[in-house]
């Protein structure tokens, strides 16, 4: 390898065949060998409860479930590739994150175990486009929602988040390549509002419905920040919000201060 995190460089130079995917390779090999554990050494510091570039005094994350780690990776935790968790989960192989620059530092264990902490970490995903489709009643409600899914599928544009009612649908996407085509087709069925320069903020943890109170803590932290969308993840492992990018740093600090202060951690 000529540089860190690059593999399979041709003998005559040229572009590498794989860059930044060594954690995916490690978990794939570990799954194939049915390893007892996969250790991922990175030059990044330990996994924090929030990105230390934007937040003062983030806590360290010592343990995550596979689902929680996957959600964090999807929503922007740079220490993990979103695809590296699936092979380990398939074979139930724990993944340990270690710091190559400080080998004696505490590590983070990712496994199928859930600990007692409800809130684990906060992640943010930038370059989001928020779109609201308000039905003009040309279609009945179930056909209206179906039509939106069909058009996004037609133009191969994945949805990061979706919230719907019988009269309107709000979505968040990170790929605007075919957005003009999508809007053009859906304008005959809906009034369309588009806002760019948005951010998804995701609070990740063990958020089973019977654990009352965490929603109130989250909303209290964000009481002064306008929210475009609120979405509960289908896996019960995250609550996500869409906000303006200019509010990102303030939102992350407010959540970190509210959710990871000592008295809250002791109660959870």
Residue ranges of model-derived segments:
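Generic structural microfeature
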Residues: 3-4, 25, 83, 147, ...
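Conserved beta-strand edge residues that scaffold enzyme active sites
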Residues: 44-45, 102, 166, 236
